[in-house]
């Protein structure tokens, strides 16, 4: 929203694009067709008039980057990939998403730490788990998350 750029505010957005990947088979999205969507691939899935990949994520966040370039702080206050897609697909999406956030210098936060969008106990099959203090962590997602915060 360029009309807001001179207000010197923190802008908070969401990190769920493309929704057909991040919310595939999400129960609360069933009326929107989440159970009927084709299985999402990353990169390369086609929806919303785009062939999604890292470059499309950069393009999607271009208006937010313009806000940041105008002197505003941008924070993607919720993001993540629901646990119904394969771990391989989720990790590929997270890798690109985190790298885009890092490149744009945007802060971000996962929807949850522990649970279906989180780093801990999300329940995706094929996960490389590590247990610390009784909590199951996705080692690969944790590594991507930490690397994504580095410049």
Enumerate the predicted regions with their spans:
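Aromatic-rich peripheral "rim/lid" segments of glycoside hydrolase catalytic domains that contact
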Residues: 86-151
